[in-house]
C-alpha cells in the first residue's frame, strides 16, 4: 500500500480546507497519515479520508509527503485565489471532491431543527458587534425559529451575553451535532467552515478578512460583506471597523435570507 503524509498545522478552517486533498489521495489508494491538530483531523479519520492522525512528525518513510507550512507549500497563496483551488493546482489534482462531509448526525443533537448562532472566531478582529446577532436572533425568533448559541473553547466571553447557549468543545462531537441543525449564522471562523462543509445553509460575516481566499467548502454558503474598497486588511485592522456596520450587515443578511426557501 502506498503511504502518504500530509502535514498542516493551523485552525479548524485551515485544516478543513485540506480535507479534499485527503479525499482525492484516498481515492488513489493511499494509506494516509496526517500531522497537525489531532482534534481536527479526527473528523477526516471518521469519514475515512485519513487512517492515522498524529500530532508530531513520525520518523518513517512515505511514498509522498505533502508539507503545508514554511518549509513546504506556502499555506497562503500569493494571489487572491481560493486556498483550496491553490492547493489542488499546486499538487496537480483534479477539482473533484465532495461538497459535503459524509458524516452521520448525532440523533440526540441539542441543535436538531434549530438555528445555530456563533458570534465568535479565532480573533476578536474578525467579530462584528454582538448586537448584529441579537438583531438576527430577534428577527428569527419573531418568525418562529428556535435559536441557540454555540459556545466553543474560544468563546467563553459569550456566556456573559447570552442565556440560550450550548457548550461543546470537541470538534468531531460538534460536527455530528451541527449536522442536524436547520442553518448556521457565524463569522469567518472554523465552525462556520465546518457548518458549510456539513451541508447546512451557512451565513458568514466577513469584515477585515478575504471571502475569496477563505471561502468554506459547501453548496449553501452565503458570504456577507459590505465590500469596502479598504477590505481585506487583516491582520492590520483599523479602529473604526466600518466594514462591520451592524445596520448594513443586517440588511444584507435579510436579503440573502429572504432569497432562500427555508
Task: Please name every model-derived segment.
Residues 1-262:
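Catalytic machinery of carbohydrate-active enzymes
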